């Protein structure tokens, strides 16, 4: 069995590992995903991840692809909390953990009001408070210490009203592990701190090494609030990292620009686009505003074209291989513990060489 691909960095005595991310589907299943995940497992990648938004779900492909693996951890990045009740998510997590032999990671996220209210038909009030309550119920169900009775601001178990016949229940299956790792997708400062307080890992979507100190402070706030000694040493941070090698830096950046335009400009309404706010904190608010204006006006290609190279290079690795290696070394010194990469199976060993040295 191959050893886990890691790079040890001394500041927090953690390892930087590689994971594979398949993301959510476009019009259909991504070509070559099964082969890539099998190759990642063979190469010693730490984890493989799926996602969902308002198309493919995260759990079904993860179970299918994961059934062809032996050791790689299997995670969701992310499951939409509004898509399932806490009980349904806990059931899925326990089932996946049994089927994988204790390799499952439950990655959750609140998403945004456009998706939650538009697709899942639920209100989007107080996402932080709802997340805290949601995670707490899941942990209680998985521990299986007794029948679950919870009456909170967002969830009633048993439900009060209706036929008035509900009763506290305990899961019929016993957990493979009483503590399944829970990661939280988060971008805002309070949500990042919440991840550090109540979860076992954080799943940012965009990250820049120049923002590392700011994020570390948010994480420290959460660690302190958790009251758990040594949590910082156990906590994981897994980031999807786009890597585009090539001699022409601008052409490599052109591969990344449409994705940045989509998220900064179109993935959320004005005033409620959390990805936009990430780039604004990085110092690109003026650019992001122009991108948003163009994208929402239907000028997607033009929105992508105005994204400067420095904005791409802040969140992705593009250009000649030596340049990528040098910049990856800076990324390894941040709070990130896992680089999540995508792409075809033959590229994975090259990613390992470029990113881990």
Sequence positions of predicted segments:
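Active-site mouth loops of central-metabolism enzymes
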Residues: 17-31, 79-86, 177-187, 243-244, ...
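Short, acidic/polar
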Residues: 28-39, 92, 186-197, 256, ...
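Conserved, mostly hydrophobic/aromatic
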Residues: 44, 65, 96, 138, ...
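Active-site-adjacent beta->alpha loops and helix N-cap segments on the catalytic face
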Residues: 56-62, 208-223, 349
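Hydrophobic faces of well-ordered beta-strands that scaffold small-molecule active sites
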Residues: 16-22, 48-50, 74-77, 104-108, ...
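N-terminal beta1-alpha1-beta2 module of alpha/beta enzyme domains
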Residues: 7-76, 180
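An alpha-helical appendage that flanks or caps ligand/catalytic pockets
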Residues: 12, 125-173, 212-330
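Alpha-helix-loop-beta-strand connector modules within alpha/beta enzyme cores
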Residues: 59-79, 83, 130, 134, ...
């Amino acid at each position: 069995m191959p050893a886990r691909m890691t790079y040890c960095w001394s500041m927090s005595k953690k390892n930087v590992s590689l994971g594979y991310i398949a993301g959510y589907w476009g019009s259909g299943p991504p070509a070559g995903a099964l082969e890539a995940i099998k190759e990642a497992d063979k190469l010693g990648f730490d984890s493989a991840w799926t996602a969902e938004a308002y198309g493919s779900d995260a759990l079904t492909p993860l179970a299918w692809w994961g059934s062809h693996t032996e050791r790689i951890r299997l995670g969701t990045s992310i499951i939409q909390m509004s898509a399932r009740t806490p009980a349904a998510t806990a059931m899925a997590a326990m089932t996946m953990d049994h089927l994988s032999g204790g390799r499952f990671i439950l990655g959750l996220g609140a998403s945004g009001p456009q998706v939650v209210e538009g697709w899942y038909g639920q209100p989007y009030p107080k996402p932080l408070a709802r997340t805290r309550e949601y995670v707490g119920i899941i942990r209680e169900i998985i521990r299986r210490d007794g029948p679950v009775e919870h009456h909170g601001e967002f969830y009633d178990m048993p439900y009060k009203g209706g036929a008035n016949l509900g009763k506290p229940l305990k899961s019929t299956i016993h957990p493979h592990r009483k503590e399944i790792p829970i990661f939280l997708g988060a971008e805002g400062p309070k949500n990042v701190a919440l991840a550090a307080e109540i979860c076992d890992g954080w799943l940012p979507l965009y990250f820049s090494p120049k923002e590392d100190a700011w994020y570390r402070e948010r994480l420290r706030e959460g660690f302190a609030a958790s009251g758990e000694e040594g949590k910082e040493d156990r906590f994981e941070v897994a980031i999807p990292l786009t890597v585009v090698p090539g001699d022409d830096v601008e052409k490599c950046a052109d591969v990344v620009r449409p994705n940045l335009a989509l998220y900064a400009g179109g993935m959320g309404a004005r005033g409620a686009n959390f990805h936009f706010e990430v780039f604004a904190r990085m110092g690109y608010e003026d650019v992001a505003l122009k991108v948003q204006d163009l994208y929402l006006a239907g000028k997607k290609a033009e929105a992508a074209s105005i994204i400067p190279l420095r904005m791409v290079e802040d969140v992705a690795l593009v250009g000649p291989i030596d340049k990528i290696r040098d910049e990856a070394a800076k990324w390894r010194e941040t709070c990130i513990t896992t680089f999540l990469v995508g792409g075809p199976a033959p590229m994975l060993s090259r990613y390992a060489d470029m990113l881990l040295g």
